[in-house]
Amino acid sequence: MKKAIIASVIALTMGAGVAHAANNANAGTIDLNFSGTVSTTTCALEPEVGGKNGIMGIQLGQTDKNTKGADIEVVFKPTADSATACAAATTDFVMQWDGVGSVFSADGLKASGGAATDSYVLVKATNAKVNNNQQVNADGFQYEFSKDDVISGLKYTMNLMGGAVVGDMTAAAQVKHWYK
């Protein structure tokens, strides 16, 4: 009898667990992306656009079909909290570009959302030691900067390259950075 009661309790518990695990038609989902680095020298950077720091959404403006849009200068500088650590570095600095939800190709960073599906974002460093003035043309593309340029800023020019399809576009990139 004791075994039968225990078996019944286990069966009820398992059944209750299944009921709670069932999908709720009103439930939503949240996708989270996490990234970070572990380093002996921490040098956190933030983008500066139009003289404003910490701009994580870069507005590329409008352009005509099949036309390169205006140059947008983006300068990556140390955050206030890491300026001292960045200045103390003794080696050159690397920035690596990867697409998020899209990929970099010879044409640039392909649109990952919006109606203008054949548009691209063009990205190129303008004060790098290695690959200077070369457009990012593949995931994993790297620029190398002099350690002295980190404090004054790692400079980039970015453009919207319109395709044949009109409309809005979105794209996202992950930029990893470290001292060599």
Residue ranges of predicted features:
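Mature extracellular/passenger domains of Gram-negative fimbrial/pilin and adhesin proteins
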Residues: 20-180
